[in-house]
Amino acid sequence: MAAKSSSSSTTTNVVTLKAAWVLPQRTQNIREVYEVGRKLGQGQFGTTFECTRRASGGKFACKSIPKRKLLCKEDYEDVWREIQIMHHLSEHANVVRIEGTYEDSTAVHLVMELCEGGELFDRIVQKGHYSERQAARLIKTIVEVVEACHSLGVMHRDLKPENFLFDTIDEDAKLKATDFGLSVFYKPGESFCDVVGSPYYVAPEVLRKLYGPESDVWSAGVILYILLSGVPPFWAESEPGIFRQILLGKLDFHSEPWPSISDSAKDLIRKMLDQNPKTRLTAHEVLRHPWIVDDNIAPDKPLDSAVLSRLKQFSAMNKLKKMALRVIAERLSEEEIGGLKELFKMIDTDNSGTITFDELKDGLKRVGSELMESEIKDLMDAADIDKSGTIDYGEFIAATVHLNKLEREENLVSAFSYFDKDGSGYITLDEIQQACKDFGLDDIHIDDMIKEIDQDNDGQIDYGEFAAMMRKGNGGIGRRTMRKTLNLRDALGLVDNGSNQVIEGYFK
């Protein structure tokens, strides 16, 4: 059972208008696009159905949230935030991908990829407990999702086995996180007081009504305890009894199967279920714990953050590609970039509307980056399109928006049309010159720019050449691509040669 209460409820504005909407724009009726089928599950706030896309026959899951359950303005905001967070995280390999959102007068519908392998919880029930190797593999995936959330300024707040699904019924199926209905954006150092979560998994500081992202690591520690033993660490016949046990914090490592569980596994659990959130392991530290690393399941070198990964990719693009991405970023829907907006605000600590070098350095440090100042300066220069010395909001969105969004045909056509002012079907030298002027770019070698993209050497860029440029080099890029003068050709060379320092991370 998920709990949700907030001290702000006394000032809540009750929504009385029948025509209140969650999404900023009206959508098609979901039944025009999908055939809604059998019921898959029922949650506290919504019902999930299987649905089939009429055009392709593809199978998806649809979470429908009835508006009659949205009693106040905050409830509507919660659903909108869930949608933003899912868009923000859904490119991660272990997060359920959101396909689209629909709304009518009675409900909001979230269409997601269909995971047919069932809940993690069900597999725990079936097996009783996993081997340490199986548990380590699963908890690594879960904590990678937690690390991804935290690096993006998102706190999940309801981690439990039921919120992780396997994509297939196979033994080696991929585990995916779902249900971000209680998740929130947060800033470093920010504390929360509303009691949310599920009884067995809730952290002691949540019960004390003063908590931050450390509470997610506690919940993951509870999941690990269950993965190894088949029972929760804090158990009682009633919710108040469970909460008392959590606040007491006494762990049982004497009952079966704990005597046969390795000391290293128990050490990790103790450090994840530390009563003090300040000394509790972070998600990053969990992934470096010997029990995980020594099993050769997690890499021995910590992954850099998503922000760093995207900035590195961005630094490998040529100038035209950067301008095109800026054009696309400005056309993305609000729900697609809502999470990035929050991330920008988190890094922009003085709320000036721009990110300075020091703010970028501090922001990267907070997400575990170990870059030298010169490397951070290269990233800053790469993102700072207009060379103002700071990164404004538009530049930040352009530098961090997931590159998969580039490849959508409608976005590429829109960006091409922006540069092709006369609608001739070609981008000419003069048109690029005008675009550089519009973007405040000086000292640009336009001939070299065209030469790099112009495959048939006719001195101009057609749509096919433009689309090819935009789609190339969008994979993981290694550490060496941060050189200030790096161009697209160099970046492609690194990708083709298979750099062994590929940056993956939560924007995968």
From Swiss-Prot:
Activation and inhibition: Activated by calcium. Autophosphorylation may play an important role in the regulation of the kinase activity.
Record-listed Ca(2+) 2 binding positions: D384, D386, S388, T390, E395
SUPFAM superfamilies for the chain: EF-hand, Protein kinase-like (PK-like)
Binding sites annotated in the UniProt record for Ca(2+) 4: D454, D456, D458, Q460, E465
Tissue expression profile of the protein: Found throughout the plant.
Residue span, EF-hand domain: 335-370, 371-406, 407-442, 443-476
Pfam family, any one: EF-hand_7
Active site positions: D158
Catalysed reactions listed for this entry: L-seryl-[protein] + ATP = O-phospho-L-seryl-[protein] + ADP + H(+); L-threonyl-[protein] + ATP = O-phospho-L-threonyl-[protein] + ADP + H(+)
BP GO annotations: intracellular signal transduction
Residues covered by the Protein kinase domain: 34-292
Binding sites annotated in the UniProt record for Ca(2+) 1: D348, D350, S352, T354, E359
Domain notes from UniProt: There are 3 contiguous domains conserved in the CDPK subfamily: a kinase domain, an autoinhibitory (junction) domain and a calmodulin-like domain. The autoinhibitory domain (298-328) inactivates kinase activity under calcium-free conditions.
Family designation: Belongs to the protein kinase superfamily. Ser/Thr protein kinase family. CDPK subfamily.
Protein name: Calcium-dependent protein kinase SK5
Provenance organism: Glycine max
